[in-house]
């Protein structure tokens, strides 16, 4: 019997690794990305490349403009993307309810295609301030998924997977390399240019660069100032 999984795919390092993990577990993968009003589209271009390279059966990009709401440095140009390293509290790069919105889209698609597994790249190590990247959030969403769907109510349970939630960036990179992920395709930068070149100074770039250093792996990221 074919096992189908919906994998949230941003085009970044973490979600690319999770897509490879789902495939390695024998799932037929369906990749889901969202054009939510983020500062650049190069991560979605990266998502297309990654989905193709890692053999996703289908890749969908859903349009849902969260810029209408704002509330995040990633969707509101009036807010600056931080470059000074991690701070206490919830980072301003948190997009209100983004993971919940995307998981709900994934849940609907999964039920439609007969999939019962959702994968996403939540990580509590690098971004412990994000409320929707905690283990208790993952467990709570799985409970919701099984209360809110026909399949769940009838006992055909959904499972929500966050396989990198307790991994360091170096561990994620090493795992991805073992699975054949080409990280040169991925875009993690909050301020990447139209060609996908990273700024090198935002917090996401800093964490990514440090991860490659800690993993002892050459950094394939293309930087704007290189």
UniProtKB/Swiss-Prot annotation:
Its cofactor is Zn(2+). It catalyses: 7-carboxy-7-deazaguanine + NH4(+) + ATP = 7-cyano-7-deazaguanine + ADP + phosphate + H2O + H(+). It comes from the Bacteria. Keywords: ATP-binding, Ligase, Metal-binding, Nucleotide-binding, Queuosine biosynthesis, Zinc. Pathway: Purine metabolism; 7-cyano-7-deazaguanine biosynthesis. It is an enzyme of class 6 (ligase). InterPro entries: QueC, Rossmann-like_a/b/a_fold. Binds 1 zinc ion per subunit. Signal peptide: none annotated. Pfam families: QueC. One of its GO terms (molecular function) is ATP binding. Zn(2+) binds at residues 189, 199, 202, 205. ATP binds at residues 9-19. GO terms for biological process: queuosine biosynthetic process. Its EC number is 6.3.4.20. PANTHER family: 7-CYANO-7-DEAZAGUANINE SYNTHASE. Catalyzes the ATP-dependent conversion of 7-carboxy-7-deazaguanine (CDG) to 7-cyano-7-deazaguanine (preQ(0)). Belongs to the QueC family. This is 7-cyano-7-deazaguanine synthase. It comes from Cupriavidus pinatubonensis (strain JMP 134 / LMG 1197). The gene is queC.
């Amino acid at each position: 019997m074919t096992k189908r999984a919906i994998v949230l795919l941003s085009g970044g390092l973490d979600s690319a690794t999770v897509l490879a993990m789902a495939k390695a577990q024998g799932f037929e993968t369906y990749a889901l990305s969202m054009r939510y009003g983020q500062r650049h589209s190069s991560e979605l271009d990266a998502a297309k490349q990654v989905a193709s390279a890692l053999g996703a059966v289908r890749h969908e990009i859903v349009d849902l403009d969260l810029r209408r709401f704002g509330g995040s440095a990633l969707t509101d140009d009036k807010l600056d993307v931080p470059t000074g390293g991690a701070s206490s509290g919830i980072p301003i790069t948190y997009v209100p309810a983004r993971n919940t919105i995307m998981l709900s889209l994934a849940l609907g698609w999964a039920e439609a295609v007969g999939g019962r597994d959702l994968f996403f790249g939540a990580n509590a190590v690098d971004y412990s301030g994000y409320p929707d990247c905690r283990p208790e959030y993952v467990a709570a969403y799985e409970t919701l998924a099984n209360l809110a769907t026909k399949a769940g109510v009838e006992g055909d349970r959904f499972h929500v997977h966050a396989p990198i939630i307790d991994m360091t960036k170096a561990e994620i990179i090493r795992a991805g390399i073992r699975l054949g992920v080409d990280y040169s395709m991925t875009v993690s930068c909050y301020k990447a240019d139209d060609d996908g070149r990273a700024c090198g100074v935002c917090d996401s770039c800093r964490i990514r660069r440090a991860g490659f250093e800690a993993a002892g792996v050459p950094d394939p990221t293309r930087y704007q100032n290189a």
